């Protein structure tokens, strides 16, 4: 078993996970029909795409095996590709696991399983006395599904660890029934500043472009709450739109190789056909593409024999290819998780190209619903089910029904600061000390010199006192909240007054007129 070397932020996350799994296990109870039953502790971990969740997962597995003489480790995922990726990670660290899912009677400590196979064979596993002491769920934002809930219910005493970049659901469902605690890593922008994620440029279609107006008019919704596939295909899978997709790649990512996210396989094939006809070597892939062919195409992409992988829901989770140089979104979405998973594929650093800057080409205006990829997110609220992981359609869209498209020029909304040097943890701490509020066009944001931390969207932001500043929204009826120096919303702006605060608590008055103290 090889020693697992972790970066400082991964080591801290490992220590935090172990602390939760060991300290809470003896005090947590499951209440059923008035009866309390002791269960193992559980924790969900949020780390941005590309920051090494699988390394942390492997380190937790090693910790469990080193400190527990009994109990298997079950690593569970919802897709075969993710299972294979986790097996490769375990191989890298010489962690032995069952070679085949079918080997129920094999005396192994680690099993890597798809949730579909596990549901079919759970009785056989129990009959063979294969009992998990630790259950690890990869891409754990899917754990809200009944199949995972059944797995947790049947193994109450096992420790549970969920790993995800996006602890949120479009339907606003809470994860608290599955995981007691959410542990968060530093925000995406911190990882970019420290050189653990790649910087990026971001271009988006214009507010009054043909394609943005088309997306604005999409009315249908699928069973998952996202845009209806059929309507997206009818409105966006047309020659003029696909030509504009090619034109934007040619203008902003010429000579680069990347990933395109399409609506469905028909759309993907149409894009690939257009790109190939115009000299951009491309292939269309989806979940029905044979696994062998998918692997061959990805390897050809790594060797630069293919310029563009046009995919459908295939590379938004678990795809690890650091030499992706551009991301093109040709499909709109209302899902925050899908948006961040798509753009996150391009932010992995490439050790062979340390000057990598990923170009994100947004041909469907997802930026207008979600903001930039490194925008601070209130993960705690989404984890608890207080906020949906869903894009907010701007209010002006409802007033644009009769607007005529002006032009199809794209707009640069972010340009990477390539002159800035990568920071150590200490340098980042000093950098954040210089964050200050600024005013632009009557609105307030946060910045460090020319670096915009938060775009000017607030009615006012006060000077920082300690690590927090007061933010205000509204004009006649103002509501107050707190921001930290990274722009994270520590206290949502929904209070009538904020009297005072320190690093531990804040005194507020709610709209009900009552004053209260809230722990931070």
Language-model region placement:
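Conserved helicase motor
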Residues: 79-81, 99-106, 114-120, 142-145, ...
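Conserved interdomain linker/interface between the two RecA-like ATPase lobes of SF2 helicase motors
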Residues: 182-259
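Conserved RecA-like P-loop NTPase helicase motor core
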Residues: 287-383
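A conserved SF2-helicase RecA2
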Residues: 189-198, 352-406
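Post-DEXD/H (motif II) to motif III coupling segment of the RecA-like Helicase ATP-binding lobe
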Residues: 142-202
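Conserved Walker A/P-loop ATP-binding site and its immediately adjacent core
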Residues: 55, 69-90
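Residue-level detector of conserved, function-critical positions
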Residues: 420-520
């Amino acid at each position: 078993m090889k020693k697992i070397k972790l970066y400082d932020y991964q080591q801290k996350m490992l220590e935090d996970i172990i602390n939760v799994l060991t300290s809470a296990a003896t005090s947590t109870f499951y209440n059923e029909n008035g009866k309390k039953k002791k269960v193992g502790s559980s924790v969900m971990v949020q780390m941005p795409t590309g920051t090494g969740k699988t390394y942390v997962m492997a380190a937790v597995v090693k910790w469990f095996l080193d400190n527990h003489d009994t109990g298997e480790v079950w690593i569970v995922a919802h897709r075969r590709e993710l299972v294979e990726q986790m097996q490769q990670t375990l191989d890298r660290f010489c962690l032995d696991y069952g070679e085949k899912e079918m080997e129920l009677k094999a005396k192994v400590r680690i099993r890597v399983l798809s949730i579909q196979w596990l549901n079919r064979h759970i009785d056989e596993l129990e009959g063979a006395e294969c009992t998990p002491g630790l259950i690890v769920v990869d891409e754990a934002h899917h754990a809200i599904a009944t199949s995972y809930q059944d797995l947790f219910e049947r193994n109450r005493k096992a420790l549970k660890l969920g790993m995800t970049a996006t602890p949120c659901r479009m339907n606003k469902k809470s994860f608290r029934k599955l995981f007691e605690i959410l542990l968060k890593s530093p925000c995406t922008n911190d990882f970019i500043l420290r050189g653990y994620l790649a910087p990026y440029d971001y271009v988006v279609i214009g507010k009054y472009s043909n394609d943005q107006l088309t997306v604005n008019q999409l009315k249908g919704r699928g069973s998952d709450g996202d845009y209806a596939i059929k309507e997206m295909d009818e409105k966006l899978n047309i020659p003029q739109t696909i030509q504009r997709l090619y034109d934007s790649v040619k203008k902003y990512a010429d000579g680069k190789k990347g990933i395109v996210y399409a609506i469905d396989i028909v759309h993907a094939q149409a894009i690939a056909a257009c790109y190939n006809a115009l000299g951009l070597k491309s292939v269309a892939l989806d979940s029905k593409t044979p696994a062998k062919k998918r692997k061959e195409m990805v390897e050809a992409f790594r060797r630069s024999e293919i310029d563009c992988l046009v995919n459908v829901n295939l590379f938004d989770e678990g795809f690890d290819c650091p030499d992706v140089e551009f991301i093109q979104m040709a499909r709109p979405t209302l899902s925050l998780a899908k948006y961040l998973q798509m753009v996150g594929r391009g932010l992995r650093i490439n050790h062979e190209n340390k000057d990598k800057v990923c170009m994100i080409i947004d041909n469907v205006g997802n930026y207008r619903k979600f903001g930039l990829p490194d925008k601070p997110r209130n993960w705690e609220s989404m984890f608890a089910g207080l906020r949906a992981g869903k894009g907010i359609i701007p209010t002006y869209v409802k007033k644009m029904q009769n607007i005529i498209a002006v032009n199809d020029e794209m707009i640069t909304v972010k340009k990477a600061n390539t002159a800035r040097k990568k920071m150590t943890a200490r340098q980042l701490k000093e950098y954040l000390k210089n964050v200050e509020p600024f005013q632009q066009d009557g609105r307030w944001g946060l910045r460090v010199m020319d670096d915009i931390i938060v775009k000017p969207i607030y009615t006012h932001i006060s000077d920082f006192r300690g690590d927090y500043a007061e933010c205000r929204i509204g004009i006649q009826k103002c509501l107050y909240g707190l921001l930290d120096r990274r722009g994270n919303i520590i206290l949502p702006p929904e209070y009538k007054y904020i009297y005072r605060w320190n690093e531990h608590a804040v005194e507020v008055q709610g709209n009900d007129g009552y004053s209260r103290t809230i722990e931070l």
